[in-house]
């Protein structure tokens, strides 16, 4: 049944005969309803719809950026200049399926050609059953977020307040032999493009069927615990500052604050593809 459900906003609009503005569409990470601008951005980014309990979900801009950063820190296989990466794969970069390292948008052929011409550094993300190369899109490379220094904390850093969670240490990783692993295509001859989530992320439905777009409940983090980007705890040392707004509220802080953490559940279950 799920295989028959539309995976793009455009297809869903055609089936429902509804405008983008009138389509109820929530973020699968933080649960908020996307506005018209964010729905249009999701559509242009080329991401796929995720279905849960009969409802379509996407991702808001903030959660998409954080999910890309989480991919970079938790699933990075190697980085390589564009020409070197092209030699490893044995295919022209223009034929690759690529997404932006920062915003997740699917790169156009001109953008991929420019990455090759400038010999930009590319990131190879290990998605378990397949690999995906990423580079900066034309928009992100011109913005502040396009600088690697604008990402959340460096790999291996800790918050200093707890032992519960930390940014994974990737310093021990070695380059992967992509030719042996097989970069393209995916297991079924296609490029999977799906947000995968683990248990306990969604709000439960009540007896009347509501709760599909519920946000996370506020929790007391207790002593010696810091806040994960994808949880709504108060990070240690924030005093009376209220940033208990889920990942959407934490995104602005994450991209310009001191080191913060990802909890183990988010590292294991939150994947952006």
UniProtKB/Swiss-Prot annotation:
The keyword Glycosyltransferase does not apply. Keywords: Activator, DNA-binding, Early protein, Host cytoplasm, Host nucleus, Host-virus interaction, Inhibition of host innate immune response by virus, Metal-binding, Modulation of host cell apoptosis by virus, Transcription, Transcription regulation, Viral immunoevasion, Zinc, Zinc-finger. The keyword Metal-binding applies. It is found in: Host cytoplasm; Host nucleus. Coiled coil: none annotated. InterPro entries: E6, E6_sf. Its main location: host cell. One of its GO terms (cellular component) is host cell cytoplasm. GO terms for molecular function: DNA binding; zinc ion binding. A zinc finger (unnamed) spans 27-63, 100-140. GO terms for biological process: DNA-templated transcription; regulation of DNA-templated transcription; symbiont-mediated perturbation of host apoptosis; symbiont-mediated perturbation of host ubiquitin-like protein modification; symbiont-mediated suppression of host innate immune response; symbiont-mediated suppression of host type I interferon-mediated signaling pathway. Belongs to the papillomaviridae E6 protein family. HAMAP family: HPV_E6. Plays a major role in the induction and maintenance of cellular transformation. E6 associates with host UBE3A/E6-AP ubiquitin-protein ligase and modulates its activity. Protects host keratinocytes from apoptosis by mediating the degradation of host BAK1. May also inhibit host immune response. This is Protein E6. It comes from Cottontail rabbit papillomavirus (strain Kansas).
